[in-house]
């Protein structure tokens, strides 16, 4: 006899799932039947929010959906924040939960873990939520989820399985096989029109986002063909290498970059929703695209949001970029206007770098020092000062090396569990498994501090760089700037070194660049996590000497 839970595990294996994140509970034990005999590794967080963040980090690095097993009720309310972050950033996540038996759904009888409507609860943070009313539906609904991940705009999917369905005898479903879907190609007529507009442009510019991560090579070739400066969103860092002459970084919120965008006569936006946290991080407004806007996105709805285009193409970013290249290579291009291209991009970069203040320079030195010690590291960030700085000043050599929760939903506590997931997904990055660095502040770390124990247990050697500024400094600045007397921001901070060591984690505090470099190299030799604490005030003093 094979139960629904056992068939689920078999089907997940067939879809290439290698990791599952979850906390077993009385309602989910049947999800685990057969898991020990499978090839799937299970990682246990200390909170379901941690499971979701781990799945998120795993997906961002590996490109595969992160999968969670979650218990009815409190498990689902706990994971919704992580689903919200993944939804906002278009991250593939499969959340499989239990739910009350079919004859008790919505009954309001006070059953253990009961919610009036669990599926409705997560409806706003999931592409869809499906209640499995029969085990026979399982292959079809999994196929629907993976079709979305493979060919649509990837976002969290929730499948809830009633307790009585989980134990159904479904031997016949053992023969079920995965379904593979390819992304849509580019419509030839739209490609022709878009190619003609790009070919006639005298000042073309490209805005590329996380939706184009897998098109890095094509994007680079397209930019070089057009001589177009390229601005990347925060999650798209590394799509052009850091020293590429056409790269203008992720500085779309700054006046000088906005002026360059305003000069462009044709702007190609590919895989980006043109949203506030990438194009207006100071919330000042004023990002304008007066030139002809061309948009490429896998989601038709997204092509007309925020900034309506002159022309839109609904297609996979890589396929569309290749089609445009083929068209551009077959026709003459308009002469570029003045110094537009590498020279104009270089002038902008020089202007920006000359304007960084002392704090920005000190935090950029911190990030550069980490990268010098760990050249191919993956940086997983929280909402914290060095991350805000790096979002503006930091560029990397390859994609999927920089992402954080300061974009989109903007939650705190993300970075530590997401870094655990990122390390587990890192084996698929090539160039050997890279080091994974968690950038997090003292306030954010206290949201998910117990996940250090998860990292120890899972033997994931993540390097936690704790930037300690003694509370919620960014919010304190907002209060002061608005003439509000600061309240609730000067929080108590514990002995992080002592807590980390008590959880089984190596930990130390450092002063200056030399100690940071030595601590990072020592961390790379360990089999488990390391916490390195950097006191903000002390760092500023040390590097200014």
Model-derived segments and their meaning:
Residues 8, 23-26, 31-36, 342-430:
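Active-site diphosphate/adenylate-binding microenvironment
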Residues 104-113, 261, 304-306, 312-314, ...:
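Thiamine diphosphate
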Residues 136, 290-383, 511-545:
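Phosphate/pyrophosphate-binding active-site segments
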Residues 124-131, 177, 344-359, 503:
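Short glycine/proline- and acidic residue-enriched helix-loop micro-motifs
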Residues 28, 48-53, 386-388, 512-516:
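Short acidic loop-to-helix transition motifs that present clustered carboxylates
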Residues 27, 50-51, 78, 118, ...:
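Catalytic-loop motifs flanking and including active-site residues across diverse enzymes
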Residues 151, 374-375, 456-461:
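Basic phosphate/pyrophosphate-binding loop/patch that engages nucleotide-derived ligands
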Residues 1-332, 369, 433, 461-464:
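N-terminal alpha/beta PP-like core and its mobile active-site loop of ThDP/TPP-dependent enzymes
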């Amino acid at each position: 006899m094979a139960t629904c839970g056992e068939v689920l595990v078999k089907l997940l294996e067939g879809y290439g799932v290698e990791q599952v994140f979850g906390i077993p509970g009385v309602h989910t034990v049947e999800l685990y039947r057969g898991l020990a005999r499978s090839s799937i590794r299970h990682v246990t967080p200390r909170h379901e929010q941690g499971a979701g963040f781990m799945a998120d980090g795993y997906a961002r690095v590996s490109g595969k959906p992160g999968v969670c097993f979650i218990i009815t009720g409190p498990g689902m309310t706990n994971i919704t924040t992580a689903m919200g972050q993944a939804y906002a950033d278009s991250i593939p996540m499969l959340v499989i939960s239990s739910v009350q038996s079919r004859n008790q759904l919505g009954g309001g009888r006070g059953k253990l873990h009961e919610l009036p409507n669990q599926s409705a609860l997560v409806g706003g943070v999931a592409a869809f939520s499906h209640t499995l009313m029969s085990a026979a539906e399982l292959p079809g609904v999994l196929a629907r989820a993976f079709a979305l991940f493979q060919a649509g705009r990837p976002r969290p999917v929730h499948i809830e399985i009633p307790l009585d369905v989980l134990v159904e005898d479904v031997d016949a479903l053992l023969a079920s096989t995965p379904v593979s879907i390819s992304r849509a190609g580019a419509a030839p007529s739209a490609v022709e029109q878009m190619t003609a507009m790009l070919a006639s442009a005298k000042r073309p510019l490209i805005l590329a986002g996380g939706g184009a991560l897998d098109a890095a090579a094509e994007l680079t070739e397209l930019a070089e063909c057009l001589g177009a400066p390229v601005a990347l969103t925060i999650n798209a860092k590394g799509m052009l290498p850091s020293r590429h002459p056409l790269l203008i970084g992720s500085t779309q919120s700054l006046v000088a970059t906005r002026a360059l965008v305003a000069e462009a006569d044709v702007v190609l936006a590919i895989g980006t929703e043109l949203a506030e946290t990438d194009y207006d991080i100071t919330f000042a407004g004023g990002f304008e695209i007066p030139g002809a806007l061309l948009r490429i996105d896998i989601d038709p709805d997204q092509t007309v949001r925020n900034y309506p285009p002159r022309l839109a193409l609904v297609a996979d970013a890589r396929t569309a970029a290749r089609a445009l290249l083929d068209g551009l290579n077959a026709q003459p291009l308009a002469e570029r206007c003045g110094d537009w291209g590498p020279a104009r991009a270089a002038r902008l970069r020089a202007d920006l770098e000359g304007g960084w203040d002392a704090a920005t320079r000190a935090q950029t030195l911190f990030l550069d020092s980490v990268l010098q010690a760990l050249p191919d590291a993956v940086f997983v960030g929280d909402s914290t000062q060095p991350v805000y700085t790096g979002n503006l000043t930091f560029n990397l050599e390859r994609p999927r090396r920089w992402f954080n929760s300061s974009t989109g939903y903007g939650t705190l506590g993300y970075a530590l569990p997401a870094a655990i997931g990122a390390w587990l997904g890192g084996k698929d990055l090539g160039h050997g498994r890279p080091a994974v660095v968690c950038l997090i502040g003292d306030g954010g770390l206290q949201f998910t501090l117990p996940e250090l124990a998860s990292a120890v247990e899972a033997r994931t050697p993540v390097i936690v760089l704790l930037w300690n500024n003694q509370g919620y400094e960014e919010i304190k600045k907002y209060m002061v700037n608005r003439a509000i007397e600061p309240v609730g921001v000067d929080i108590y901070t514990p002995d992080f070194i002592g807590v980390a060591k008590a959880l089984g984690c190596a930990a130390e505090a450092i002063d200056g660049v030399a100690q940071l470099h030595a601590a990072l190299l020592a961390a790379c030799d360990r089999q488990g996590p390391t916490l390195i604490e950097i006191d903000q005030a002390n760092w500023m003093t040390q590097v200014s000497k």
